[in-house]
């Protein structure tokens, strides 16, 4: 039975105790750890979360609504809503604001403090009539559910739409870089460039909007490329980092993708926490359907938030069950 930590984990303890940021070199070394060392790395990540994370032991829970679905012109390889793919998916235009209010109220009454309006498509470079309808939805939620943090994920934004979202009091805006930016065109999509997303992030931040930006694991990336994504997120100084685990969907190019092992995913979550001690790290897609019995482990590997109540085109878990999970996880902080 071993009595000492792996030297690279010991080095990480020493570095983080000084308050110095995790270096790319040390993160890469941690990414090469054998599976037998993962629980020690998870323990370190949980300690860092307990000491530094913005939520101070609380779980950041959010829920989303697919307010406009399908027929997206972008060719994201994992997505059922792309018209380039043949997945079966519900198709509908922007829903009525009463439906948005109904779903937001349900989440709010179950104790969920953040609610996101999500639409399919490239985004909004200008303020269009449809975008104005979304602004109206945001205003309605603020009026009728005071205290709810209203969020959105509407794709790439131009200057004017970003400024309007700030004026209407959006709390967080989600737009993911998904992978190491250098591999975006190959692994995710080539109908748009990752720099269009990065430009949106910078517009949002310049308008004072908190940015929710992360990635997806299991699309063909290497561990080193996951670390590249993690450090790109640090350079962008985002507020919330959602980490998704690919749920392969029939009719998409990734329908037969090989799953990433649980130790690899746990290492990724832990390294993300070590690189982002104070940020909210949110476990999103794949938590229930792919990780199943191991989702608690990944929450202890540095995550302090999750998406609950379902995703855009795949099922999730009911909110009451997730609230019980949150109560149990809080005992480890």
Swiss-Prot record:
It is an enzyme of class 2 (transferase). Keywords: 2Fe-2S, 4Fe-4S, Biotin biosynthesis, Iron, Iron-sulfur, Metal-binding, S-adenosyl-L-methionine, Transferase. [4Fe-4S] cluster binds at residues 72, 76, 79. Binds 1 [4Fe-4S] cluster. The cluster is coordinated with 3 cysteines and an exchangeable S-adenosyl-L-methionine. Binds 1 [2Fe-2S] cluster. The cluster is coordinated with 3 cysteines and 1 arginine. NCBIfam families: bioB. Homodimer. This is Biotin synthase. It comes from Chlorobaculum tepidum (strain ATCC 49652 / DSM 12025 / NBRC 103806 / TLS) (Chlorobium tepidum).
């Amino acid at each position: 039975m071993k009595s000492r930590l792996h030297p690279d984990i010991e080095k990480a303890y020493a570095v983080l105790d000084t308050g110095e940021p995790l270096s790319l070199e040390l993160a890469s070394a941690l990414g090469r750890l054998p599976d037998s060392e993962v629980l020690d790395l998870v323990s370190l990540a949980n300690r860092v979360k307990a000491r530094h994370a913005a939520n101070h032991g609380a779980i950041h829970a959010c829920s989303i609504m697919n307010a406009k679905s399908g027929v997206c012109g972008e060719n994201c390889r994992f997505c059922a809503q792309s018209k380039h793919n043949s997945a079966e998916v519900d198709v509908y235009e922007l829903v009525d604001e009463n439906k948005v209010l109904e779903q937001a109220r349900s989440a709010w009454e179950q104790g969920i403090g953040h609610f996101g309006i999500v639409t399919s498509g490239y985004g909004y470079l200008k303020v269009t009539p449809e975008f104005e309808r979304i602004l109206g939805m945001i205003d309605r939620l603020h009026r009728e559910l005071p205290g709810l943090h209203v969020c959105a994920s509407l794709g790439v934004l131009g200057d004017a739409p970003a400024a309007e979202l700030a004026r209407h009091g959006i709390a967080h805006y989600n737009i993911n870089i998904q992978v190491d930016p250098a591999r975006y065109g190959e692994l995710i999509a080539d109908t748009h460039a990752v720099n269009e997303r990065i430009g949106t992030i910078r517009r949002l931040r310049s308008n004072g909007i908190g940015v929710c930006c992360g990635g997806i694991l299991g699309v063909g990336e290497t561990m080193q490329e996951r670390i590249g994504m993690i450090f790109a997120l640090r350079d962008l100084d985002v507020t919330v980092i959602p980490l998704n685990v690919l749920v392969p969907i029939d009719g998409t190019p990734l329908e037969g993708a090989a799953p990433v092992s649980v130790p690899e995913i746990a290492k990724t979550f832990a390294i993300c926490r070590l690189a982002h001690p104070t940020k909210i790290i949110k476990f999103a897609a794949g938590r229930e359907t792919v990780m199943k019995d191991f989702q608690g482990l990944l929450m202890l590997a540095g995550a302090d938030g999750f998406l609950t109540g379902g995703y855009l085109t795949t099922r999730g878990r009911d909110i009451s069950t997730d609230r019980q999970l949150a109560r149990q996880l809080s005992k480890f902080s």
